Amino acid sequence: MFDHISIQVASFAKTLSFYTAALARLGYVPQYVDDTAKSAGFGPEGDVRLWIAEGKPAAKVHLALRSPSREAVGAFHTAALRAGGKDNGKPGLRPDYHASYYAAFVFDPDGNNLEAVTHEAE
């Protein structure tokens, strides 16, 4: 089990705005923001799990974040698109993964594939 993950982003301000809007629907909120160092940490209250920092982005990554419900998956997708993300898979079942795998995918401003997923049966 990982403790946290950190990704480099091309524009801290743009990505901070995107992740703040998109991740709130999953219960991930900014826990730490340093405009001088151009870094921020997101997670559930009191627990930072995802860090972003301005720098030279590395290879594109796929981040799958657990969602509390199918409704939250849909809300994440809508919020991410409104915040400037690009659709990479509308909310829905992915039976090729397993019968109750419900997910949505968006590309963030740097082209990383961000996924919200729940494994709960409806």
Residue ranges of each PLM-predicted region?
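Glycine-rich acetyl-CoA-binding "A-motif" of GNAT/NAT acetyltransferases
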Residues: 113
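Short glycine-/small-residue motifs
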Residues: 116
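Short glycine-enriched loop/turn motifs at secondary-structure junctions
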Residues: 1, 56-59, 98
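Long, continuous compositionally biased terminal/linker segments
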Residues: 38-82
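N-terminal beta-strand motif that seeds the catalytic metal site of vicinal oxygen chelate
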Residues: 1-16, 63, 120-122
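Core segments of cupin and vicinal oxygen chelate
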Residues: 6-48
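Vicinal oxygen chelate
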Residues: 11-13, 65-110
